[in-house]
Amino acid sequence: MNLAKRILQGEQLTKETVLKIYEDTNIDTLDLLNEAYILRKHYFGKKVKLNMILNAKSGICPENCGYCGQSRDIKQKQRYALIPEEQIIDGAKVAHDNHIGTYCIVMSGRGPSDKEVDHISNTVRTIKSQHPQLKICACLGLTNDEQAKKLKSAGVDRYNHNINTSENYHDNVVTTHSYKDRTDTIELMKANNISPCSGVICGMGESNQDIVDMAFALKEMDADSIPINFLHPIKGTKFGSMDDLTPMKCLRIVALFRLINPTKEIRIAGGREVNLRSLQPLALKAANSIFVGDYLITGGQPNQLDYDMINDLGFEIDYDTCENKENKNEVSRAN
């Protein structure tokens, strides 16, 4: 194949070429993953970036996203308003103590009120005064220009707003907002010099063409960070009984995203534990970033298992991206 070599020499793969490769059953997934690893190693070495999520506001949402346990259609769910500043600040200390590079503050809902943006902004200022090198990612929904400027001024480094799926498949996933609403939000953040983070959820019934289209859309968007989520079906949601993924399919998807976005941070995110299962470590041959700890309303695995996974691969935590560089040997024993 020599895909990695061709890409490093400047070749731009087309959608048609990538789809053909992705669907070719004669191309072994592990061979494809090895091509992705050549690119991952070239641009990121063996380092793994760590991220942590805080669910700062839960279950209060008017949207009908078919994958989400916080959507308006779910009656039994965890509901609480935006938590106090002190709790968010405490979460930042946990992130610092666990060698996390990026701390992600997430809110449910269509978008934040001005009061909520002020609350988050004040909190971020305090966090930055205590942990100046800890990167802050906000995920608050649809925002306006004034709100984006406030977040930037407060010290927010990155803003996450996932496209989730392809433009073609979008209305099968949610109808209360448009695909353009999502892409416009990312463009707004870029206009305000906030690093754009946008990713996908795979396993919602999308086609192979949709998967390829998602990866190219994020390339065209120039997202700095790309989280790849794998559907963790939640009872009562539209996709609650969906079972469309295997560990090998997940690996093939991650490899494809690396081939199309060779220089970007690619993160294996929600659903990795239940979908990749014993093959989680192999995903880091293509991805260079993970979430540590729990997700929004589903649990992750114990932190130490993630540290061990990184060590066992011969990889290492990317200490260049985290503030806490002390006691490295407690979490990283790689040579």
From Swiss-Prot:
SUPFAM superfamilies: Radical SAM enzymes. Keywords: 2Fe-2S, 4Fe-4S, Biotin biosynthesis, Iron, Iron-sulfur, Metal-binding, S-adenosyl-L-methionine, Transferase. Binds 1 [4Fe-4S] cluster. The cluster is coordinated with 3 cysteines and an exchangeable S-adenosyl-L-methionine. [2Fe-2S] cluster binds at C104, C137, C197, R267. Transmembrane segments: none annotated. One of its GO terms (biological process) is biotin biosynthetic process. InterPro entries: Aldolase_TIM, BATS_dom, Biotin_synth/BioAB, Biotin_synthase, Elp3/MiaA/NifB-like_rSAM, rSAM. Its cofactor is [4Fe-4S] cluster; [2Fe-2S] cluster. It catalyses: (4R,5S)-dethiobiotin + (sulfur carrier)-SH + 2 reduced [2Fe-2S]-[ferredoxin] + 2 S-adenosyl-L-methionine = (sulfur carrier)-H + biotin + 2 5'-deoxyadenosine + 2 L-methionine + 2 oxidized [2Fe-2S]-[ferredoxin]. SMART domains: BATS (SM00876), Elp3 (SM00729). GO terms for molecular function: 2 iron, 2 sulfur cluster binding; 4 iron, 4 sulfur cluster binding; biotin synthase activity; iron ion binding. Its EC number is 2.8.1.6. The keyword Iron applies. [4Fe-4S] cluster binds at C61, C65, C68. Coiled coil: none annotated. Residues 43-269 form the Radical SAM core domain. Pathway: Cofactor biosynthesis; biotin biosynthesis; biotin from 7,8-diaminononanoate: step 2/2. Homodimer. Belongs to the radical SAM superfamily. Biotin synthase family. Catalyzes the conversion of dethiobiotin (DTB) to biotin by the insertion of a sulfur atom into dethiobiotin via a radical-based mechanism. This is Biotin synthase. It comes from Staphylococcus aureus (strain NCTC 8325 / PS 47). The lineage of its organism: Bacteria, Bacillati, Bacillota, Bacilli, Bacillales.
